[in-house]
Amino acid sequence: MEFPFDVDALFPERITVLDQHLRPPARRPGTTTPARVDLQQQIMTIIDELGKASAKAQNLSAPITSASRMQSNRHVVYILKDSSARPAGKGAIIGFIKVGYKKLFVLDDREAHNEVEPLCILDFYIHESVQRHGHGRELFQYMLQKERVEPHQLAIDRPSQKLLKFLNKHYNLETTVPQVNNFVIFEGFFAHQHRPPAPSLRATRHSRAAAVDPTPAAPARKLPPKRAEGDIKPYSSSDREFLKVAVEPPWPLNRAPRRATPPAHPPPRSSSLGNSPERGPLRPFVPEQELLRSLRLCPPHPTARLLLAADPGGSPAQRRRTRGTPPGLVAQSCCYSRHGGVNSSSPNTGNQDSKQGEQETKNRSASEEQALSQDGSGEKPMHTAPPQAPAPPAQSWTVGGDILNARFIRNLQERRSTRPW
């Protein structure tokens, strides 16, 4: 490959090694600084043209080797020139090979993943006019000696069929290890330990300081033992104790504030797994008898007394209080009941109280008649007012008082004979 400038003046050696800085070789005596800047521009032109020729030979859509990529990556290029051919005394370029270290994940013979950082063949090109003349072997062998590696320790990026035949012919590399990426490795790749890339100057300083400093390293921190997977449960009973919320009982049992106390023993797994982690097991409700007893103990409101005096059998409180009474007493408490005479069929205490009430009423009426006969001359008047019952005693809201028994209901029925229908 020919160029319009002098290649021999640019590359004094047959094989020239260039890194990412693209600096020209040692300056010849008598060269000036502007001339050196022009030499670097010429090197960039050579690399760009070699990359285009390689992409065309491999049928690639874009070149993979260029001066800009060389400056942004830590790759090395080996350039081979033809010193014998001197067209117009300027020399020519035969080919090049680009290598670099890359971190790869490759599979071994047992299909196990391995993280390695081998030296990779990234691009290799020899001009078509000088192929099969030993130039490729010469360039490849020089690179192996310079990098101090063996052919089977290399990883090749997207090799062409010509390159695979070249390696099989000169280095007996035929059996490959299948990979999931675009790199190809050969049998024996894992037989030797790969040489890591050249350490930087900063890493070398740190390594030297560590070798000189006799301070012992800090002991490694011990990690807690890992729990066995068999002990792990999705929702364990012990982990959910703090999530349980006490269920508030119904009114009126929720007057006194209650604090939710955690249970002494966690519930069994059968009962705990049936509930949500945010809700605990529901508490049983209070029986109806206890609820009615608590209602009787509650002091009434003053307006309830007036309502009871106006409508003794129709107030909701009276209906709640007589819910547990026998049917006979319930019928007697209603104004429209037809069971007014039922007072001796039931042997309970309600019927006994009703009998005592009737007897006291008769005694009161007899005493009033005697008092009227003693007043005046002793003759009965023609028109006398009907005897009025004395004012009932003051109603007392006490447990077991007259207001809750059948006698009080009977007295109310005698004073009020009006029927709702």
UniProtKB/Swiss-Prot annotation:
GO terms for molecular function: L-lysine N-acetyltransferase activity, acting on acetyl phosphate as donor; tubulin N-acetyltransferase activity. It catalyses: L-lysyl-[alpha-tubulin] + acetyl-CoA = N(6)-acetyl-L-lysyl-[alpha-tubulin] + CoA + H(+). It is found in: Cytoplasm; Membrane, Clathrin-coated pit; Cell junction, Focal adhesion; Cell projection, Axon. The modification Phosphoserine is found at S272, S276, S315. Residues 226-235, 355-367 have a biased composition (Basic and acidic residues). One of its GO terms (biological process) is spermatogenesis. Residues 196-235, 252-284, 306-402 are annotated as: Disordered. Changing K102A: Strong reduction in acetyltransferase activity. It is an enzyme of class 2 (transferase). Changing E111A: 2-fold increase in activity. Changing I64A: Strong reduction in acetyltransferase activity. Residues 1-190 form the N-acetyltransferase domain. The modification Omega-N-methylarginine is found at R323. Changing V106A: Reduced activity. Changing D108A: Reduced activity. Acetyl-CoA binds at residues 124-137, 160-169. Residues 209-221 have a biased composition (Low complexity). Its main location: cytoplasm. Its EC number is 2.3.1.108. Belongs to the acetyltransferase ATAT1 family. Specifically acetylates 'Lys-40' in alpha-tubulin on the lumenal side of microtubules. Promotes microtubule destabilization and accelerates microtubule dynamics; this activity may be independent of acetylation activity. Acetylates alpha-tubulin with a slow enzymatic rate, due to a catalytic site that is not optimized for acetyl transfer. Enters the microtubule through each end and diffuses quickly throughout the lumen of microtubules. Component of the BBSome complex. Interacts with AP2 alpha-adaptins, including AP2A2, but not with AP1 gamma-adaptin (AP1G1/AP1G2); this interaction is required for efficient alpha-tubulin acetylation, hence clathrin-coated pits are sites of microtubule acetylation. This is Alpha-tubulin N-acetyltransferase 1.
